[in-house]
Amino acid sequence: MVHFVGAGPGAPDLITRRGAALLADADCIIYAGSLVNPALLGLAKPGCAIYNSAEMTLEQVLDTIRAAEKAGGTTVRLHTGDPCLYGAIREQMDALDADGISYDDTPGVSSFCGAAAALCAEYTLPNVSQTVIITRMEGRTPVPEAEQLAKLAAHGATMVIFLSIGLVDKVRQALLESGGYRPDTPAAVVYKATWPEQKVVRCTVSTLAAETRRNGITKTALIVVGDFLGENYERSKLYDPAFTTEFRQGTEAGQ
């Protein structure tokens, strides 16, 4: 049996209870060593075989899983954040399907949630943004034409940009290209969200590249953009005295 497990954004106590239990029971752990906090490996039982997938190809990962299966062991494939975002899990699952190896998936706290926590911010504010775009800048891995960053920026919605801090000049240019964001639209760079060395750099779209360089951030960071980082928003209807819900009768006058 193979368990795909989300390790969470960084802090070891942010893994789910289920994920921690699966780690503690595993006979084999294959973890994404470039981003997963190694402190989580302290949950492994004595004798557990541990492999760093940052040093492996897909074929080597699969061969390691097959060997563990042949020995009757349980494998945890430990991915950073939540495996569903940029986790490259589909190709692994398809190979396991072809081999007849059973697997399941345990979600984790994504780094985009960790970034919001670091900012003490809410991505979806009434009359500001009700949409969150999660994307990346095109690099060695292409993106579909319709999902080019400049085209997505035209929406002006809250945007969280993964895997792109090394292309921050191109990111800045793309964000301004369509006019969806103003030069003074608030932005932030969150380095290693929830880790002890977490760093938050607040800026604007215009100053994004310069502030990133000034703070020496070159990797392991998210870029967040949008007016949700500003001061203006409307009160939520959910807790408005005049708003009737399944659990509470509202008043017309709001008194």
Regions found by a protein language model. Give the residues of each.
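Class I SAM-dependent methyltransferase SAM-binding "motif I" and its flanking Rossmann-like core
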Residues: 84-155, 199-202
